Amino acid sequence: MRAIETTVPLPLDEAAAVVRAALAENGFGVLTEIDVAATLKAKLDVDRPALKILGACNPGFAHQALQLDPNAALLLPCNVVLEPAPDGGTRVSAVDPRALMPEPEFAELAESAAAKLTAALDTASHGTTGS
């Protein structure tokens, strides 16, 4: 799956705070946070490495997408995944909106959303935000 990816030079919990701030600077709010490792431990008693999913939404982009096609709700919110990076720090990835919305009527919107997600992850990759 085509993704926008970066590494944040911080442990996962600290990286999550930096990613949240970087998303906010780029117009995204975090609507949900799922601790996948904790959920799987609680429900299935299995251990796995840390994995968090932030459900991020840019209201303007969401509104535009829904105006173009109500089924765009199936793609909301945008998942931003955080997991320990093999070489240290935290790997952060999001599905590239251009891959999710290949239809011509979504091209401009998908490009704008990808640019904002890329900017957010680029900011987060420095381990700090502009705030």
Where in this protein do the model-derived segments appear?
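Residues at alpha-helix termini
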Residues: 25, 42-43, 123
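Beta-strand/loop substructures that line and gate deep hydrophobic ligand-binding cavities in soluble
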Residues: 79-103
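Well-ordered alpha/beta subsegment
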Residues: 97, 101-131
